[in-house]
Amino acid sequence: VITPASREGASRVRRECTASYVGDGFWLTAHHCVSQNPSMDGYLEQFDGQRAGIAGIYTLSDTDDVALIEVGPGIDADTFEVAQDPLDIGQQATLTGYGETHDYASSATTTIVAHRDEIDFGSAVYTDLFEALSATASRSCSGDSGAPVYIGSTIYAIHTGGGYNPSCVDGKDMLMWHTNIAPRATWIKSTIRMNAGLTESEESKAAAGLGAAPLDEPVSSDVDQGSNRPLTVS
């Protein structure tokens, strides 16, 4: 999200969330990452410095913490498969995201301990989530919202929230909540299918978002190894 830093019109970059590539120029993230500004001008940035401007944002509903971001060209990424079946209680998966204070991605093993029909987070009520615990000292922190919860190359959930942790402090057996992707898979696939390809106005919007990126050359940082890599939403 690009916000004015001064009356002279200068801008600063604020890294908000993490997103994962699901094909045809679309990236999956959390609804609460985009709900306050669904027409935002901005861009996505990958670990290697590749960037793509935001062309459009699609949401399912105010109670489904999922969103799709369509982008213009600029990023080469492997594609996550979208799960058709949910994770089971006791099953473990990997959560990989960008903490707000970090310039690199890190991973945590998350253990599913319960299914929650609804959770009131104060600012929003979201439905159909997994409740989970961090299996090791690695846990979620601010900036990880929208991050993939995956096994192999299949994404089963996206990270919605956890205990307050703005400084990204470690902690084992810490609570986290992830939005279940399986019941939203049909919406994800149909939205991509019906909106694949950029209109002229979407191309212009993507170019404007990319134009807001800093002029300095981004520096590649260490990230977790794997064929599918989440990136930050700016």
Language-model regions, residue ranges each:
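Short conserved beta-strand and strand-loop elements enriched in small hydrophobics
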Residues: V1-T3, P38-Q50, Q91-Y98
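Extracellular/periplasmic catalytic domains that process cell-envelope and extracellular macromolecules
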Residues: S11-V13, Y21-V22, T59-T63, D85-I89, ...
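Short, small/polar residue-rich loop motifs at catalytic or cofactor-binding pockets
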Residues: V13-E16, C141-S145
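Chymotrypsin/trypsin-fold serine protease catalytic domain
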Residues: T63-A137, D173-K189
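C-terminal subregion of chymotrypsin/trypsin-like serine protease catalytic domains
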Residues: Y21-W27, S145-T232
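Catalytic-histidine neighborhood of serine endopeptidases
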Residues: R14-E16, V22-D64
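Acidic glycine-/aspartate-rich tracts in secreted/extracellular proteins
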Residues: H32-Q36, G72-D76, G99-H102, T154-I155, ...
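N-terminal activation segment of mature serine protease catalytic domains
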Residues: V1-R14
